[in-house]
């Protein structure tokens, strides 16, 4: 049993964990301490992205928190519909001054300066996500990348500095399949080609990690179940990007909001200090929430009396180039903040209760629903069927391996291997064993990732660089000092400066995607042993493609 698996066994919650008695007692105790302390002092929390799905859940929790913080929120002036809804919901708090609204863009220095002035904490939830990031990639650049840079610069210049909680994304890990279903912070970050959302979030996250902010924490959000999920996924062809065998770990929006509230409450009442600040975490979910893409569709269609097989065909959805993992270290945040209260089953039960009319669809022929809803969405520009019809070879290659591979997908479910049914690429598999965290297969990043920070030496830095096909340029390193930047060199000879924490503990390694919308992992993986472990799970070693986007954000595709 490796140290990796010993750590999992030591810290993992039980398989059907929701919220233990001890966790509840812990949460109550922390809230009580926070309330007592907040009778003597007041904090201000600046929050971005409050009109989004996670943002709404965070606002619900913070406005009900024992902290009773002053909340200063940033809202886009052009987002009139959602801004009006927000003002109506929190009218009383706005009148009392408990909630203050700053209208502006996250990339606008003046608006951001006004937002964070005098704040004790900043919670950055703002993000342009798919499908909007696919339709308007320039907005993703402005918010996810430039917005993060603007926010970081403002906090760096503030005196005193507020503490920053930055929400990142599981999308940084890129595509995973049955060979490497599990990931942990520190795994390589191979953002999927053409996914401007993940590329801009990658750059935004690194900006935080390399910043001069004294207290920051980066939380990589997993797949999130929220009240608008069904409606949002029936607007364009994005649902067809979800691989049926993709590992998805579903946290609910409610629990995400609880997490943020508990972080602030504990930091006020009983600061976690070194256990939390200046670290990256995965936002994990209860074990029963780890399922596949197909099972997710199945759960949703069960509301109308059907199944995934009733409405989809194997060839409708991508077979690679998505994002999703099960978190081997998702329990770490739970141990600190006891936020996991909802299962996926609970979420679907709540959706059914709130939308009882969904059950009326049970009397409608399934073939008719498929034609009117699913087949209609396949005509959308964001759907594979559209790419095929219009000859978008770049996207067909990125998501399927090529046009021939797309055409060769089976028409019948009997001929398509579903992991959840015990069928893998090369034959039968034990799905329950794959879902068991004790069987997680760790990525070899070149050094012993289970070492304590204090035991990291220059040999570990050199080994990590070598595993990436590069080298450590700096000749000195104080053992355990993961936050003093050092120089590294990539396989292409590019020299870059980064903190050892960013590379060894957070998985960053410089490539062209960090500065432009170019994805060339086919080439990089041939010399990068860390990338190769993931990339070749779903890509051929003979593939020689470069995926990119032009200055006007049009997709490009060419051979090396």
Question: Can you name each region flagged by the protein language model?
Answer:
Residues 191-217:
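Active-site Tyr-X1-5-Lys
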Residues 265-336, 340-350, 355-366, 371-434:
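Mid/C-terminal beta-alpha module of Rossmann-like enzyme folds, strongest
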Residues 128, 149-196, 217:
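Conserved Rossmann-fold NAD(P)-dependent oxidoreductase catalytic core, especially the SDR/UDP-sugar
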Residues 209-262, 297-300:
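NAD(P)-dependent short-chain dehydrogenase/reductase
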Residues 107, 139-150, 195, 199-200, ...:
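Glycine-rich NAD(P)-binding loop of the Rossmann-fold in SDR/ketoreductase-type enzymes
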Residues 415-560:
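Functional cation/ligand-contacting sites centered on basic and imidazole/sulfhydryl donors
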Residues 43-65:
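N-terminal Rossmann NAD(P)H-binding glycine-rich loop of SDR-like oxidoreductase domains
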Residues 92-146:
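NAD(P)H-binding glycine-rich loop region in Rossmannoid oxidoreductase-like domains
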């Amino acid at each position: 049993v490796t140290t990796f698996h010993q750590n999992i066994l030591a810290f993992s919650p039980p398989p059907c964990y929701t919220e233990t008695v001890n966790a509840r007692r812990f949460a109550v105790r922390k809230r009580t301490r926070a309330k007592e302390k907040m009778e003597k002092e007041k904090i201000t929390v600046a929050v971005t992205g409050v009109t989004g799905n996670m943002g709404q859940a965070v606002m619900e929790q913070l406005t009900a928190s024992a902290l009773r913080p002053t909340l200063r929120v940033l809202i886009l002036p052009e987002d009139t519909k959602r801004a009006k809804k927000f003002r109506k919901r929190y009218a009383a708090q706005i009148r009392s001054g408990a909630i203050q609204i700053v209208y502006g863009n996250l990339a606008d220095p003046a608006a951001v300066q006004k937002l964070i002035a005098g704040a004790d904490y900043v919670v950055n939830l703002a993000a342009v996500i798919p499908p909007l990031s696919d339709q308007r990639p320039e907005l993703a650049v402005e918010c996810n990348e430039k917005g993060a840079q603007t926010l970081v610069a403002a906090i760096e210049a503030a005196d005193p500095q507020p503490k920053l909680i930055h929400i990142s994304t599981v999308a940084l890990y890129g595509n995973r399949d049955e060979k490497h279903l599990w990931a942990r912070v520190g795994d390589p970050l191979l953002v999927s080609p053409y996914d401007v959302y993940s590329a801009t979030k990658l750059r935004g996250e690194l900006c935080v990690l390399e910043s001069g902010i004294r207290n920051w924490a980066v939380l990589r959000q997993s797949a999130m179940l929220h009240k608008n999920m069904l409606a949002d996924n029936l607007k364009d062809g994005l649902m067809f990007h979800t691989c049926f065998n993709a590992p998805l770990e579903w946290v609910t929006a409610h629990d995400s909001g609880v997490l943020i509230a508990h972080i602030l409450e504990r930091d006020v009442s009983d600061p976690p200090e070194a256990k939390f600040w200046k670290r990256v975490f995965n936002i994990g979910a209860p074990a029963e929430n780890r399922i596949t893409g197909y099972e997710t569709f199945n759960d949703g269609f069960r509301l109308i009396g059907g199944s995934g097989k009733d409405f989809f065909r194997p060839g409708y959805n991508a077979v690679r180039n998505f994002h999703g993992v099960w978190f081997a270290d998702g329990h770490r945040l739970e141990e600190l903040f006891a936020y996991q209260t909802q299962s996926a089953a609970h979420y679907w039960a709540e959706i059914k209760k709130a939308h009882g009319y969904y059950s009326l669809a049970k009397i409608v022929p399934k073939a008719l629903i498929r034609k009117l809803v699913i087949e209609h969405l396949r005509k959308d520009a964001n759907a594979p069927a559209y790419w095929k019809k219009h000859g978008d070879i770049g996207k067909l290659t990125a998501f399927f391996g090529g046009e021939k591979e797309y055409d060769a997908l089976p028409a019948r479910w009997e001929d398509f291997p579903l992991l959840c049914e015990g069928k893998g690429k090369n034959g039968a598999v034990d799905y329950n064993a794959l879902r068991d965290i004790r069987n997680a297969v760790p990525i070899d990043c070149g050094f012993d990732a289970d070492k304590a920070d204090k035991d990291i030496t220059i040999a570990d830095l050199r080994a990590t660089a070598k595993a990436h096909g590069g080298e450590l340029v700096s000749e000195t390193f104080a053992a355990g000092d993961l936050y003093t930047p050092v120089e590294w060199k990539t396989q292409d000879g590019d020299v870059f400066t980064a903190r050892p924490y960013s590379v060894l503990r957070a998985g960053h390694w410089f490539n062209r995607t960090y500065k432009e919308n170019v994805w060339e992992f086919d080439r990089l993986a041939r010399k990068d042993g860390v990338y190769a472990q993931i990339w070749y799970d779903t890509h051929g070693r003979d593939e020689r493609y470069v995926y990119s986007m032009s200055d006007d954000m049009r997709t490009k595709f060419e051979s090396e």
